[in-house]
A protein has these predicted regions:
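Catalytic cores of peptidoglycan-degrading enzymes
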Residues: 4-144, 149
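Short, solvent-exposed mixed-charge patches
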Residues: 151-153
Length: 153
């Protein structure tokens, strides 16, 4: 299950769901989140998995797809460079590529998707869970208390 943020600095520029398409100017469903940052910003695998595809895909540009098991998949688009290959095993936190503006893009950003059984789902809940877990673990490490809700990493 995706449980960390795909980039260190999370500056969301486009949410999941319906929005005005920047190329067509009409309302269209956006199947992921757009996270802005400088070209070359490291992109991290948000969970352990196997690379399904690492290639150019129309619209997405340089694209990485990670299969996490249990029909969960994450997709990373518009990369400037890919750091993985199809069939490679990756671990949560591994650098899988670098932010860019390839494909159908208006500027440097990461397009991040989570899919379950092939259907896009809102990645926001996964990112919120990652942030809350991080905050709990940091507070637990700083305070003289026991960690609750999972192992401290």
């Amino acid at each position: 299950v995706p449980s960390i943020n795909p980039v260190e600095s999370m500056r969301l520029t486009s949410q999941y769901g319906y929005r005005s398409d920047p190329f067509q100017g009409r309302r269209k469903n956006h199947k992921g989140l757009d996270i802005a940052g400088p070209i070359g910003t490291p992109i991290y695998a948000t969970a352990d998995g196997v690379i399904g595809r690492a290639q150019w895909v129309s619209g997405y540009g340089k694209y990485v797809e990670v299969e996490h098991g249990n029909a969960i998949q994450t997709r990373y688009g518009h990369l400037s460079a890919m750091n993985v290959y199809s069939g490679q095993r990756v671990h949560k936190g591994d650098i899988i590529g670098f932010m860019g503006s390839t494909g159908r893009s208006t500027g440097s950003h990461l397009h991040y998707e989570v899919r379950i059984a092939g259907e896009p789902v809102n990645p926001t809940s996964f990112l919120e869970a990652a942030t809350k877990t991080s905050n709990i673990l940091i507070a637990s490490k700083d305070a003289d208390s026991k960690s609750v809700g999972g192992p401290a990493e």
